[in-house]
């Protein structure tokens, strides 16, 4: 199960990973997936908790976050010793989420206070178990589960932000033509 890159950030990250990994052959990868009846959903939640076999669906592979194995270990009911998900390292793309202050905001002091709070060690140490993302502060302590299943693959697929900005619309249009039509 994959997510539509136009409506889902994990879907976009996976599309970008395939572009980085396969280069000019990325469209062929998607053609093959499509010929094998890949399921496409609009969002992560419906793919993971709906279509994926661990969520009761019929698909045995799902695009998800590198932190999914940790979340499964912590929240599965009934508990599991081995998560139903794994990381395929050469399929990973680094997804970064940002917070910023708008240039002409009328609430600059409040916006600065929010950014300061988001960057505080206390908040950063709450991120892993609440959002299953890595904190931005390197000095933030990680929960034990994050040492059992480390979530930072050693070989990430990367594309520069400028290249993404220049090509994103074209890439998603090609993807839509290849997979959805």
Residue positions per predicted region:
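Short loop->beta-strand "edge-of-pocket" segments that line small-molecule binding or catalytic clefts
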Residues: 1-20
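Solvent-exposed loop/turn segments at secondary-structure junctions
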Residues: 6-10, 67-70, 92, 106
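Short helix-loop capping/hinge motifs at secondary-structure junctions, enriched
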Residues: 7-8, 20-26, 105-111
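Solvent-exposed, polar/charged alpha-helical surfaces in well-ordered, non-transmembrane soluble domains
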Residues: 16, 31, 46, 50, ...
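Ligand-binding pocket segment of bilobal, Venus flytrap-like solute-binding proteins
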Residues: 17-91
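Sec-exported extracytoplasmic/periplasmic mature domains
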Residues: 19-23, 35-38, 53-58, 67, ...
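Mature extracytoplasmic/periplasmic domains
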Residues: 93, 99-158
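Extracellular/periplasmic bilobal clamshell ligand-binding domains
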Residues: 144-181
């Amino acid at each position: 199960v994959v997510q539509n890159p136009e409506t889902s950030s994990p879907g976009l990250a996976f599309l970008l990973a395939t572009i980085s990994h396969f280069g000019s052959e990325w469209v062929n990868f998607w053609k093959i997936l499509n010929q094998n009846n890949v399921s496409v959903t609009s969002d992560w939640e419906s793919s993971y908790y709906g279509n994926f076999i661990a969520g009761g669906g019929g698909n045995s592979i799902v695009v998800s976050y590198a932190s999914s194995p940790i979340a499964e270990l912590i929240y599965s009911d009934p508990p599991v010793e081995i998560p139903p998900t794994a990381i395929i390292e050469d399929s990973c793309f680094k997804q970064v989420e940002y917070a910023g202050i708008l240039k002409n905001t009328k609430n600059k002091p409040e916006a600065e206070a929010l950014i300061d709070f988001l960057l505080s060690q206390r908040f950063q140490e709450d991120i892993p178990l609440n959002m299953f993302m890595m904190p931005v502060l390197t000095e933030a302590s990680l929960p034990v589960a994050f040492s059992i299943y480390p979530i930072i693959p050693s070989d990430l697929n990367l594309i520069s932000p400028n290249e993404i900005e220049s090509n994103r619309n074209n890439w998603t249009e090609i993807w839509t033509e290849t997979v959805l039509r």
